[in-house]
């Protein structure tokens, strides 16, 4: 695929625009401050966008009293088309900001690309903060396949990283691994999926599905967390022909082995009532001109508090 750089015209300078930008930064800081849990954050989640949300939501199902923050590093989206040094730099920069701001008890990397490239460096640089990574569920796929043909739907960087090849060699040596990098599908999930019609969603996933059907894969690993959002669409179209697997259960279980938040004690005034689950806050990175509306809508649908742009 050829990558073409497109120069964007410089916006006309307007004095009022600077005042609006400054006001927006102040408002974002107010939002950020108001959404920081009063108690210590149990888990911080990081992805380049919305891919890690299914992991956060699944953790909240199992541990509703967990204090969580989620940061979508939209400033650096997508990670999957970058080279390894740039991914490490971006992930470490984001993690440093999150740790300084929220001081999480544990960190969940809700991104396969970050995990196979930068997890070791994150653990080294920010020790003793524990990091839980997300890697392609090749081991599980190998245990489920009937014909020995496993598909891997992921980003280019995840597919090309030696760590992924090591997983395949260790757990699926007797299987054929059929890989497909699909940056267009990642972009669709991030920027179009949540407002798309059913027909548009099916059209978007069809090329990937047809690819794996053509190669007779009976089990496909969703090796990019963004693809968990489209799993129901893939399952509907594939029927019994393909089983789709991911690492969500294993990642969440590991996170909860490290930190197991307990339900808060009921106050004396409401001792008979059950404490309410802790809300989770969602932040993005980027510039003041980024379109925040889709993320606000997604938070409303997911029961998350929108915190705005993380400074």
Model-derived regions, located:
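Non-catalytic structural scaffold of enzyme domains
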Residues: 1-8, 24-25, 29-311
């Amino acid at each position: 695929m050829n990558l073409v750089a497109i120069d964007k015209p410089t916006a006309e300078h307007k004095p009022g625009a600077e005042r609006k930008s400054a006001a927006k930064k102040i408002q974002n800081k107010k939002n950020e401050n108001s959404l920081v849990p009063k108690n210590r954050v149990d888990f911080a989640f990081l992805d380049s966008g919305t891919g890690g949300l299914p992991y956060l939501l699944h953790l909240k199902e199992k541990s509703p009293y967990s204090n969580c923050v989620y940061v979508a590093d939209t400033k650096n989206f997508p990670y999957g088309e970058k080279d390894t040094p740039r991914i490490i730099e971006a992930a470490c920069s984001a993690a440093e900001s999150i740790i300084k701001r929220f001081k999480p008890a544990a960190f969940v990397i809700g991104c396969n690309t970050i995990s196979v490239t930068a997890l070791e460096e994150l653990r080294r640089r920010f020790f003793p903060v524990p990091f839980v990574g997300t890697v392609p569920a090749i081991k599980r796929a190998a245990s489920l396949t009937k014909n020995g043909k496993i598909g891997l739907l992921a980003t280019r960087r995840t597919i090309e990283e030696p760590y992924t090849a090591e997983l395949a060699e260790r757990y699926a040596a007797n299987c054929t691994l059929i890989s497909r990098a699909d940056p267009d599908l990642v972009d669709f999930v991030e920027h179009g999926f949540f407002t798309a019609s059913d027909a548009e969603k099916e059209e978007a996933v069809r090329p990937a599905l047809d690819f794996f059907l053509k190669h007779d894969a009976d089990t496909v690993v969703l090796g990019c967390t963004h693809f968990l959002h489209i799993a129901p669409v893939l399952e509907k179209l594939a029927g019994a022909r393909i089983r789709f697997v991911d690492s969500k259960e294993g990642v969440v279980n590991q996170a909860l082995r490290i930190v197991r938040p307990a339900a808060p004690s009921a106050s004396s005034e409401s001792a008979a009532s059950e404490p309410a689950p802790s809300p989770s806050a969602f932040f993005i990175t980027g510039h003041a001109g980024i379109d925040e509306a889709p993320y606000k809508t997604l938070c409303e649908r997911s029961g998350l508090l929108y915190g705005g742009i993380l400074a």
